[in-house]
């Protein structure tokens, strides 16, 4: 009995009419059974109709793999209606990861060779969609012939198919290189767009092609100039802009050809200025062309005035009502802040206004750019804006904002008092979101500023009395009260509001910290130690302190219990030594000195900081990488691995004698740190070399050098690094993203790693790149670094 089969339109209506998912599955299962039966009967007139219904079922997410062989039969059919559905089914149902797709190679070859343009177009579309590297190598000669066909319809599709072939197998570049120059002379916009895309792909994957196509820069400039000066055309204009797609693609190609090549850059400078000044910005099409123009100007050797014009265009984008355009402007300015810092500074006020954006992505990008714009001349004004933003910013931005403010204050603080005030404000506003080393840095800073001890202890005492919920603030205040409690009681500070503090008030405040449920065990440890130190600084009876300390002798926290037992023993057995043991901490040399940009600035507050050479401003978002979950705890020392390390240099007896006499001595230059090869695969090698500046012992400069000895280029190379949480990592921009084959110019990238605790260093690296047409990703840990990198 013949079962009536639904038409495609009827099947769609019936599926859409299903009220439940179960009804939909029932309809589809019933129809799939009829489709299978029709395939078994082998009716050639119904095959393409049945496959069309099966493709619709596949689009809904239901299995349709049993139709793969029917696709092959339809492709081999001489009828165009069969081929059309067969090729569509092949693009949807066949996968280059399975060998079944290779069965259509011969059919595609035959269709490409015949003169039927619609059939050739179907074959080219299928090949460019799911053609594997093997298919591309077999069919490249046929596609090359079609590049010179008189029909623009076929040539457009052949050009785009060639782009796919080069992506799958870069070795095919030599086949498609010669026809490009001739194709570029075509006046058909579709052919021009495809040709520019093909040349771009060739230049990105083949250095020889890059050198070859630099000769056509004048031709590209002329094409773009014609587009800019041409009036309105109904065929090509979009929102009043003449073919913006072709303009954008030409600008991208010019950016590649002009990078690191002065002659090509000079050829396109005038044109870029013309595009930047004449493009209409009232519609998105014009904004897209302007953005590509700006990126091209900044990537090539352009004139200084042209670069300023590009930054001003981005500044106008910041005032646009479209949030997407503002986000693009902030992102582009963040990329340009390294090369044109002064030009970006002109738009600082507009960038700061973007901090108040309601969109989280915009405010985050504005925060990163604002932190990157901080320098010694604007640090006071910028810190006021950032501190105001910190008070009202969303919780997910508070940690980044607080960390960025602390880092900027560390580098550009105009005075120690200003630095202390800034950190105190951050701890008071967002103490729970600061880095782990903020407490240690502030205590060290206060310890160094002897003239600010009274000011600091009184400020911290007042802040602690108002709020004990911010744990970092409580820890710093407890430490400072313990060290300088005598100044709190006796000292007078003109820079703070006068108030009288009694011994009972100080002890009661520390007891409140100990009893608070919000206090962490570490905070209670600070408070107990502060009480012990106050026992030698206060003139009253110490019985109250002894009673409080003795309570924690039975604490469930082992650290607090041990500390309390030791302090009780100090009271009972070594009371005569207590004053000497609990005296003020000596000054500790800072491992990360203040770095500040050159230039004179008036110092109106206490103790100006020393001015040193500037460090490059980096986006703060890349400075702070919390990688605890990637590397785990790093408290234990790591194995040194297989690298050959040099022993540390021991001082000579004469040098030791000079140190004993406290005479000035110039330290000998440090021994060079041996480099380490951390990665090697298929001709790609990654070596790390190290340097520790004498003036900043806690800073390690790591230079990652990547070389390629294979026979094929490595493209789209990206190296990312991660460090444990106790370190601070700053990744500088790499020298490029393409490594030429057979020992070409390597890629170098510098990592700035700050290790204030001198902990054993280990890295986690992730490499992503394309090699032999295949994407590669490698993730590995490096734990064989020389001991000289941290000791």
Swiss-Prot record:
Compartments annotated for it: namely: Golgi apparatus membrane; Cytoplasmic vesicle membrane; Endosome membrane
Primary localization class, coarse: Golgi
Source organism per entry reads Mus musculus
Oligomeric state and interaction partners are given as: May interact with AP1S1/Sigma1A-adaptin and AP1S2/Sigma1B-adaptin. Probably does not interact with APB1. Interacts (via GAE domain) with RABEP1, NECAP1, CLINT1 and AFTPH/aftiphilin. Interacts with HBV major surface antigen L. Interacts with HBV core protein C in a ubiquitin-dependent manner. Binds ubiquitin.
What family is this protein classified in? Belongs to the adaptor complexes large subunit family.
Q: Which domain of life is it from?
A: Eukaryota
Q: Which Gene Ontology terms of cellular component type are present?
A: AP-1 adaptor complex; endosome membrane; Golgi membrane; Golgi-associated vesicle; membrane; synapse; trans-Golgi network; transport vesicle
Protein name per Swiss-Prot or TrEMBL: AP-1 complex subunit gamma-like 2
Q: Does the keyword Membrane apply?
A: yes
């Amino acid at each position: 009995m013949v079962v009536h089969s639904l038409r495609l339109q009827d099947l769609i209506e019936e599926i859409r009419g299903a009220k439940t998912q179960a009804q939909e599955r029932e309809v589809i299962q019933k129809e799939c059974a009829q489709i299978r039966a029709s395939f078994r009967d082998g009716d050639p007139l119904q095959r393409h109709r049945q496959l069309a219904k099966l493709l619709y079922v596949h689009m809904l997410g239901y299995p349709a793999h049993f139709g793969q062989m029917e696709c092959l039969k339809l492709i081999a059919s001489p009828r165009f209606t069969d081929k059309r559905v067969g090729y569509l089914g092949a693009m949807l149902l066949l996968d280059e990861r399975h060998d079944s797709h290779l069965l259509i190679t011969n059919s595609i070859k035959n269709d490409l060779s015949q003169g039927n343009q619609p059939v050739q177009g179907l074959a080219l579309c299928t090949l460019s969609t799911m053609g594997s590297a093997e298919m591309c190598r077999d069919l490249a000669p046929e596609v090359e012939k079609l590049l010179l066909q008189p029909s623009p319809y076929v040539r457009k599709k052949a050009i785009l198919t060639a782009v796919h072939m080069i992506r799958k197998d870069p070795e095919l570049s030599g086949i498609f290189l010669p026809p490009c120059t001739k194709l570029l002379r075509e006046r058909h916009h579709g052919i021009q767009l495809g040709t520019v895309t093909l040349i771009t792909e060739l230049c990105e994957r083949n250095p020889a092609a890059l050198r070859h196509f630099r000769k056509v820069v004048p031709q590209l400039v002329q094409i773009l100039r014609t587009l800019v000066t041409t009036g309105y055309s109904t065929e090509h204009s979009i929102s009043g802009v003449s073919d913006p797609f072709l303009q954008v693609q030409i600008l991208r190609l010019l950016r590649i050809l002009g990078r690191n090549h002065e002659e090509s850059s000079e050829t396109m400078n005038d044109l870029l200025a013309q595009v930047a000044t004449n493009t209409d910005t009232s519609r998105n099409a014009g904004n897209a062309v302007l953005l590509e123009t700006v990126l091209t100007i900044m990537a090539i050797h352009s004139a200084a005035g042209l670069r300023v014009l590009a930054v001003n265009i981005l500044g106008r984008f910041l005032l646009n009502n479209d949030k997407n355009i503002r986000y693009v402007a902030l992102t582009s300015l963040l990329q340009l802040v390294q090369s044109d810092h002064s030009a970006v500074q002109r738009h600082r006020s507009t960038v700061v206004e973007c901090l108040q954006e309601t969109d989280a992505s915009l405010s985050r990008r504005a925060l990163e750019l604002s932190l990157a714009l901080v320098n010694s001349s604007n640090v006071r004004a910028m810190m006021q804006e950032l501190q105001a933003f910190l008070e009202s910013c969303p919780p997910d931005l508070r940690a980044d904002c607080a960390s960025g403010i602390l880092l900027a204050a560390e580098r550009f603080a105009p005075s120690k008092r200003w630095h202390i005030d800034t950190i105190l404000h951050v701890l008071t506003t967002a103490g729970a979101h600061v880095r782990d080393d903020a407490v240690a840095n502030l205590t060290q800073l206060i310890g160094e500023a002897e003239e600010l001890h009274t000011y600091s202890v009184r400020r911290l005492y007042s802040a602690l009395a108002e709020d004990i919920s911010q744990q970092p603030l409580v820890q710093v205040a407890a430490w400072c009260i313990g060290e300088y409690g005598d100044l709190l009681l006796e000292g007078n500070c003109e820079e703070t509001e006068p108030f009288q503090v009694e011994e009972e008030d100080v002890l009661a405040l520390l007891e409140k910290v100990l009893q608070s449920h919000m206090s962490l065990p570490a905070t209670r440890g600070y408070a107990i130690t502060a009480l012990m130190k106050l026992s030698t600084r206060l003139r009253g009876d110490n019985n109250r302190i002894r009673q409080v300390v003795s309570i924690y002798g039975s604490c469930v926290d082992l650290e607090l219990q041990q500390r309390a037992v030791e302090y009780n023993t100090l009271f009972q057995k070594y009371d005569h030594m207590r004053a000497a043991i609990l005296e003020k901490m000596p000054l500790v040399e800072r491992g990360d000195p203040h770095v500040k940009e050159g230039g004179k600035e008036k110092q109106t507050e206490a103790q100006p900081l020393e001015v040193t050479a500037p460090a490059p401003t980096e986006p703060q978002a890349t400075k702070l990488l919390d990688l605890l979950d990637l590397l785990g705890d790093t408290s234990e020392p790591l194995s040194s691995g297989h690298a050959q390390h040099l022993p540390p240099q021991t001082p000579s007896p004469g040098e030791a004698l000079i140190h004993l006499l406290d005479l000035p001595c110039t330290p000998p230059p440090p021994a060079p740190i041996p480099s380490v090869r951390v990665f090697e695969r298929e001709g790609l090698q990654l070596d790390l070399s190290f340097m520790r500046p004498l003036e900043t012992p806690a800073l390690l400069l790591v230079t990652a050098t990547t070389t390629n000895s294979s026979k094929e280029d490595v493209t789209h190379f990206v190296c990312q690094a991660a460090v444990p949480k106790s370190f601070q990592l700053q990744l500088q921009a790499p020298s490029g993203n393409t490594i030429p084959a057979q020992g070409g110019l390597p890629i170098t990238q510098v990592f700035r790693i700050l290790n204030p605790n001198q902990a054993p260093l280990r890295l986690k690296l992730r490499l992503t790149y394309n090699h032999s047409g295949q994407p590669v990703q490698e993730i590995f840990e490096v734990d064989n670094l020389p001991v000289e990198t941290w000791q």
